[in-house]
Amino acid sequence: MLDSIRTTIPAKDGVRAGDLLNRDFTAPRPDHTWVTDFTYVRTWAGWVYVAFILDVFAQRIVAWHAATTKTTDLVMVPLRMAVWQRRHEGHPTAAGELIHHSDAGSQYTSVRFTEHLELEGISPSIGSVGDAYDNALMETINGLYKTECIRTTVFHPGPFRTIADVEYATAAWVEWYNNRRLHSSLGMVSPTEYEHAHYSAIDRERQPV
């Protein structure tokens, strides 16, 4: 049964940070706040778990990762990918200026994960256990992913047999979501376009008169 799958299981020996957002899912710039969570997809071979990291400013998915187990690597891999992606784009994250917000799942409170956040200079923020509103933006993204990608044949022509099928569909959906899906909250532009406009405005301000 789908209802029997729990993604938020608190760790007995984890490191529990406070909630720095208090349900305020807005940001003044890119890489001010990342929200993250993972969801699950049923395949013929078993459950697949898909983790996303979303930049709150433009609601852009900066990284994602799929796995067949709910270990710390499920959330560690996209974190490393997100940091690398920003550096590759010429906008590296700055120590002490980025908040990473998640639920209280054992993956996010593990010593290994919290130590890596500290290494990157990222401030951890964790909502309360069992309260979806404390990570409402990611709950919305997970819902869109299920509705637009998993429960349709738009991004995959048939049932999901293995993790490879999930990865194929997810990659296509993320590309569409970031670059072509129009958001009313962003003025009917895509997350990538909204973010690009922000950096273009900064570049214009820096140009000599």
Task: Please provide the spans of the model-predicted regions.
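Charged DNA-binding/catalytic regions of mobile-element recombinases
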Residues: M1-V209
